[in-house]
Amino acid sequence: MKRDDLIFDIIEKEHQRQLKGIELIASENFVSDQVMEAMGSCLTNKYAEGYPGKRYYGGCEVVDQSEQIAIDRLKEIFGAEWANVQPHSGAQANAAVFLAVLNPGDKFMGLNLAHGGHLSHGSLVNTSGIIYTPCEYNLKQETGRVDYDQMEEVALREKPKMIIGGGSAYSREWDYKRMREIADKVGAILMIDMAHPAGLIAAGLLDNPVKYAHIVTSTTHKTLRGPRGGVIMMGKDFPNPWGKKTPKGEIKMMSQLLDSAVFPGIQGGPLEHVIAAKAVAFGECLQPEYKEYQKQVQKNAAVLAQALIDRGFTIVSGGTDNHSMLVDLRSKYPTLTGKVAEKALVSADITVNKNMVPFDSRSAFQTSGIRLGTPAITTRGAKEDLMLEIAEMIETVLSNVENEEVIAQVRARVNKTMEKYPIFAY
């Protein structure tokens, strides 16, 4: 068979882009060779509808083993009693929880998307906001942190069936204990989407929501540094509170509802090659060097945030507890949009994404902010000294967004600097 040079040339172009640039998108990371190897394995050939030991296809004895290892390792990392590793993505994991917990039209509550929430937590263009009825809580304008008092007020008034914690652009620790107290007051299920800080939580550097929430979802990429995918967990299984029964008349456990919501609810056959790669990544999470990596992610984020503050940038909430930060450009560059800032930085081979900031006056297509994160650059071996350089280069570019010569100089500096850093240093 003739090799598809067209596609493989494109893949090599992307490889070179990743090698030469500084990756600061908070949701991106670089996987190890063994994770990549598992993803590209012959397991991609196997159909395996169902779950280990209960499949709808024959010949699943081998993939049963790799999927069970993924489940067991994930449970060990987070202290969970039950886990499902089949969701194809974090959004799919969230959609499965919605299907298990809510009926169409039911009310739920999540963080305002414009304040750092995620589109799968109630955006009106996402299934979560189309099929179900969202209400929202916000950040405090003066602190840039979650307003738990307002969350409680909204919960008591709206009586949501489910409350969601977690977001895509929130740099601070969450008060899971308070959220559980609020959920219990109104009889709601508490779901925590820990997709962004999951790796830091796995390393014990941030509080573990599995101890507090009824249900926890996550992606397996981002800080967790695995393949692209999703998972669902529970600290403790429990009988479903709505009295749903098995054909034998027994009350179904919540794990049964969640398993059924993933398959056959929203997915068919699982991606067993990706699940094997998840298992490999979870094995890496259990190694001592993984905690050292996550400590460096956290250190690098704190140093980068402070270096930007020292240069006159505004960081929402004044800093970061995790791997990420949201830069409000308005104070330093009043006329500069996130869209223009992103384009200029990408031209200098510094990859970021535009992002709305709390109480933004601009649209989601323009924005007044950019989001930055340190997981990927830390995987390449970066330490605090490089963060100081990066802050300097960001300021140089954003002060010269229309000066192609300056941007070219920064790009050359970025490319030269990154020659010293492998894609995967751990």
From Swiss-Prot:
Subcellular location(s) per record: Cytoplasm
Q: Where is the signal peptide?
A: none
Swiss-Prot/TrEMBL cofactor(s): pyridoxal 5'-phosphate
- The UniProt record lists the EC number as 2.1.2.1
Against PROSITE patterns, the record matches this protein to: SHMT (PS00096)
* Top-level EC class as recorded in UniProt: transferase
Q: Which reaction does it catalyse?
A: (6R)-5,10-methylene-5,6,7,8-tetrahydrofolate + glycine + H2O = (6S)-5,6,7,8-tetrahydrofolate + L-serine
Tagged with keyword Translocase? no
The PTM N6-(pyridoxal phosphate)lysine maps to: 222
Gene3D superfamilies named in the record:
Aspartate Aminotransferase, domain 1, Type I PLP-dependent aspartate aminotransferase-like (Major domain)
Protein origin, superkingdom: Bacteria
Under the cellular component aspect of Gene Ontology, which terms does the record hold?
Answer: cytosol
Q: Which GO terms fall under biological process for this protein?
A: glycine biosynthetic process from serine; tetrahydrofolate interconversion
Q: Name one GO molecular function term.
A: pyridoxal phosphate binding
Pathway listed for it is: One-carbon metabolism; tetrahydrofolate interconversion; Amino-acid biosynthesis; glycine biosynthesis; glycine from L-serine: step 1/1
Q: Which CDD domains match?
A: SHMT
Listed A to Z, the keywords are: Amino-acid biosynthesis, Cytoplasm, One-carbon metabolism, Pyridoxal phosphate, Transferase
Site-annotated residues for Plays an important role in substrate specificity:
221
Q: What does the entry list as the binding residues for (6S)-5,6,7,8-tetrahydrofolate? A: 113, 117-119, 363-365
Recorded family membership:
Belongs to the SHMT family.
Q: What does this protein do?
A: Catalyzes the reversible interconversion of serine and glycine with tetrahydrofolate (THF) serving as the one-carbon carrier. This reaction serves as the major source of one-carbon groups required for the biosynthesis of purines, thymidylate, methionine, and other important biomolecules. Also exhibits THF-independent aldolase activity toward beta-hydroxyamino acids, producing glycine and aldehydes, via a retro-aldol mechanism.
Instruction: List, alphabetically, the NCBIfam families matched.
Output: PRK00011.1
Oligomer and partners: Homodimer.
**Protein name as catalogued:** Serine hydroxymethyltransferase
What's the source species for this entry?
Answer: Bacteroides fragilis (strain ATCC 25285 / DSM 2151 / CCUG 4856 / JCM 11019 / LMG 10263 / NCTC 9343 / Onslow / VPI 2553 / EN-2)
Q: What is the lineage of its organism?
A: Bacteria, Pseudomonadati, Bacteroidota, Bacteroidia, Bacteroidales
Recorded name of the encoding gene: glyA
